[in-house]
Regions:
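Conserved acetyl-CoA pyrophosphate-binding loop and the N-cap/start of the following alpha-helix
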Residues: 93-105, 238-241
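Conserved acetyl-CoA binding element of GNAT-fold acetyltransferases
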Residues: 79-91, 226-236
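Short, high-confidence coil segments that cap the C-terminus of an alpha-helix
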Residues: 50, 113-115, 202
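Short amphipathic alpha-helix that is part of the acyltransferase structural core
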Residues: 1-69, 76, 83, 149-188, ...
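Short hydrophobic beta-strand motif reused across regulatory alpha/beta modules
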Residues: 65, 133-134, 218
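Amide-forming acyltransferase catalytic core, primarily the GNAT-like/NAT-type
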Residues: 139-241
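Conserved active-site alpha-helix within GNAT-family acetyltransferase domains
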Residues: 112-116, 122-140
């Protein structure tokens, strides 16, 4: 077995292992508006700008471990962090200690880059807890009926729908992150991952105050008479309303 960083010429094997491990089917690609070649092309920046280590059996990629370089607000101080993702192994190579080796090598590389924190979305909390991670936040989903929402609000500004790459929208997130503990600052890689599986009918609405200054946004999808809110942030009570 050989361990080494992945290069752009490993993109086919990288993409194949991701699709196999996370069960991304042709139907999933079609429903999200992607084609396989487009997904593969979109992953080139990851291999260029992220730290991806793979384990090879000869010329065959058996396992991989990716770390995205990001920044995070932790109690008002900005830290460089490594966001762990694309952790996957073909089943015939599991139980051989490969992932443990990839994890150690990746964490050692993070340490050399002065990234003191490693973050991830665990598919198994007990598994990663045994390896030293702990929960820093929870995700709670709410189902709200339209009649439960206040119809009269005191918000003198205006709401405008904008494009996904609107600069005011992305700057709003950075402004929010500067004052919010536990919030990541999104760089280009993070924004690409944020949108990767969203449907084309997903919208971004930005609230502007009377001075035409953006104060909050909502990312949402309306489907089958239901509104799904992916993300909502606001800088003040006016924007919240």
């Amino acid at each position: 077995m050989t361990y080494r960083p992945l290069r752009t010429d490993d993109i086919d094997q990288y993409n194949d292992l991701l699709r196999y491990s996370f069960q991304i089917t042709e139907q999933d690609l079609a429903e999200s508006g992607w084609k396989n070649d487009e997904i593969k092309q979109s992953k080139f920046p990851v291999l260029d700008r992220a730290d991806v280590i793979g384990c090879f059996d000869g010329q065959t990629l058996a396992s991989q471990f990716a770390v995205y370089p990001l920044k995070m607000n932790i109690y008002g101080q900005v830290y460089a962090v490594g966001f762990v993702t694309s952790v996957c192994t073909y089943p015939e190579y599991s139980g051989k200690g490969i992932m443990k080796q990839l994890m150690y090598r990746s964490l050692a590389h993070m340490r050399s880059k002065h990234e003191p924190f490693a973050l991830l979305y665990p598919y198994s909390i007990p598994l990663y807890r045994r390896r030293g991670w702990e929960i820093i936040s929870n995700k709670i989903s709410y189902i709200v009926k339209d009649r439960q929402i206040t119809s009269s609000v005191n918000a003198p500004g205006m709401v405008h729908r904008v494009e996904w790459d609107d600069q005011a929208f992305m700057n709003l997130h950075n402004t929010f992150a500067q004052t919010t503990h536990g919030c990541l600052f999104r760089n280009s890689i993070a924004w690409e991952e944020y949108w990767r599986w969203e449907k084309d009918d997903t919208f971004v609405a930005v609230y502007y105050d009377t001075n035409h200054s953006p104060q909050g946004y909502m990312v949402y999808l309306v489907e089958a008479d239901k509104m799904y809110i992916k993300e909502m942030i606001y800088l003040n009570r006016e924007a919240q309303e």
